[in-house]
Amino acid sequence: MRTSQYLFSTLKETPNDAQVVSHQLMLRAGMIRSMASGLYNWLPTGVKVLKKVENIIREEMNKGGAIEVLMPVVQSAELWQESGRWEQYGPELLRFSDRGNRDFVLGPTHEEVITDLVRREVSSYKQLPLNLYQIQTKFRDEVRPRFGVMRSREFVMKDAYSFHTTQESLQQTYEVMYQVYTNIFTRLGLDFRAVQADTGSIGGSASHEFQVLASSGEDDVVFSTESDFAANIELAEAIAVGERQAPGKAMELVDTPNAKTIAELVEQFNLPIEKTVKTLIVKGATEDAPLVALIIRGDHELNEIKAQKHPLVADPLEFADETEIKAKIGAGVGSLGPVNLNIPAIIDRSVALMSDFGAGANIDGKHYFNINWERDAAMPEAFDLRNVAEGDPSPDGKGTLQIKRGIEVGHIFQLGKKYSEAMNATVQGEDGKPLVMTMGCYGIGVTRVVAAAIEQHHDERGIIWPTDEIAPFTVAIVPMNMHKSESVRAFAEELYQTLKAQGVDVIFDDRKERPGVMFADMELIGVPHMVVIGEKNLDKGEIEYKNRRNGEKQMIAKDRLLAFLAENVKA
């Protein structure tokens, strides 16, 4: 491609509204332009990268035995009503009516559509297992689109769905897809972790996320220092260690009028934060217990996903408001604790091991110090309620936990019969009777992969694509003063035609621009291999080569240039 015939839309300045590196560089490199909040036009450079990522995904999915299909973006509301998600899905689901006043949605995912398709097309157990996938646009009406294409409203996704007669068959395909995803992200050159995860609104049983490690990530990824254990922080089990010590002091009621938070209590009374607890009041799941207290250590964070799995806690978890709390307990949120508490309580496992600790007295402006279980308050049920912390023991007993930020780029689920039962998706079994199909679901955020690759691989000059396979161009020809030097123009033209004929994705910068501008643009868009042709070097029989990844420069004999590029460039 010649730059003179290309839409080359680089920017010198970083737009003010771009918060993360990938958004900044995708705008500056001329990959995307915003049309509206969370909606982007993809320009030629961006499309080239996107299609290369799609092709890698497609190749690996095909190797794994999946078959490509294409389903409509617009979906019938009847299918969503049949599955039960019409009522369950929140405002992210864009709903509209056609001219016949029939309800439709703009698809955020395709479980309903694929289940409907397969129940129509597959009738016998002999046709299973079956794994179908598509690469297609999705729409989710995010309340706060941000970070460019990392969290946009419209995005490209690869979603696959498998259908089985048994759980064992699903498990086999799940393991194949786990390996396919590992192959995809390895081939993309990403530093990633496959982690155990919560199934969320998709539903199902087993689930793994594929997280690209990056400081700008929205998820906390937890992994062991000495084993393969890895999990999303939402799912990582917190292990309580040690034994509860015997009481050391008598319980004391203390005036704390200016201590509304744990931080204020610790500072004003010089208490170790790990010797305090905080009491959080949430809505209960039953009429008998409309409010429930969750008690965790002062230095720990509540894990809402874990908490809402307790049978006493409403799912989804909802915090009680101040009015409800005061009406029931008689004190505000800054003065709550386990002593004389008149609602059911659940304590974190670590709280069960505490002694001589401080907590609110359920009287405004007062706290109890030196509380001990059984002596001062009945021991409630202990449950895993908290997020793990850096340095906690690994749940598998090997090593301690590290926590890093991650960008979720892939997610695989064992759906089981959640959708097939709801939508009566059956085949004839071996015994001739109807058999409800068992399903799996496997997604990759294609547009997010592009952003994640940039988050991991960039420098002050621009993008550094982790592999030649996804760079918009693999080789840049930069002829200096070509329009004034016939020898430079002729050599550059010959090299361009030769590389094109060899199938190399090459960009020929034939603009009448200063060399510095040309270099900066090619580095900004991340072309991994740059060939710089200057008249003086050409007269000496040499060509300058620059490697974008390691920054190295070297002079190559011009008669060896093609052989050198063949050895170093992945076409």
From Swiss-Prot:
Keyword Ligase set for record = yes
EC number(s) for this protein?
A: 6.1.1.15
**Keyword Nucleotide-binding annotated:** yes
- Biological processes, Gene Ontology terms: prolyl-tRNA aminoacylation
Q: Where in the cell is it found?
A: Cytoplasm
Q: Which Gene3D superfamilies does this UniProt record tie to the protein?
A: Anticodon-binding domain (3.40.50.800), Bira Bifunctional Protein, Domain 2 (3.30.930.10)
EC class of the enzyme, as a word = ligase
Annotated membrane-spanning segments are: none
Where this protein primarily resides, as one coarse class? Answer: cytoplasm
Highest taxon in the source lineage: Bacteria
InterPro entries from the entry? aa-tRNA-synt_IIb, aa-tRNA-synth_II, aa-tRNA-synth_II/BPL/LPL, Anticodon-bd, Anticodon-bd_dom_sf, Pro-tRNA-ligase_IIa, Pro-tRNA-synth_IIa_bac-type, Pro-tRNA-Synthase_IIa_type1
Q: Which GO MF terms does the UniProt record name?
A: aminoacyl-tRNA deacylase activity; ATP binding; proline-tRNA ligase activity
Keywords on record: Aminoacyl-tRNA synthetase, ATP-binding, Cytoplasm, Ligase, Nucleotide-binding, Protein biosynthesis
Recorded GO CC terms: cytosol
Catalytic activity entry: tRNA(Pro) + L-proline + ATP = L-prolyl-tRNA(Pro) + AMP + diphosphate
Pfam family of this protein, just one?
Answer: tRNA-synt_2b
Swiss-Prot/TrEMBL domain comment: Consists of three domains: the N-terminal catalytic domain, the editing domain and the C-terminal anticodon-binding domain.
Summary of subunit composition and partner proteins: Homodimer.
User: What role does it play?
Assistant: Catalyzes the attachment of proline to tRNA(Pro) in a two-step reaction: proline is first activated by ATP to form Pro-AMP and then transferred to the acceptor end of tRNA(Pro). As ProRS can inadvertently accommodate and process non-cognate amino acids such as alanine and cysteine, to avoid such errors it has two additional distinct editing activities against alanine. One activity is designated as 'pretransfer' editing and involves the tRNA(Pro)-independent hydrolysis of activated Ala-AMP.
Q: Which family does it belong to?
A: Belongs to the class-II aminoacyl-tRNA synthetase family. ProS type 1 subfamily.
Q: What is this protein called?
A: Proline--tRNA ligase
Species the sequence originates in? Actinobacillus succinogenes (strain ATCC 55618 / DSM 22257 / CCUG 43843 / 130Z)
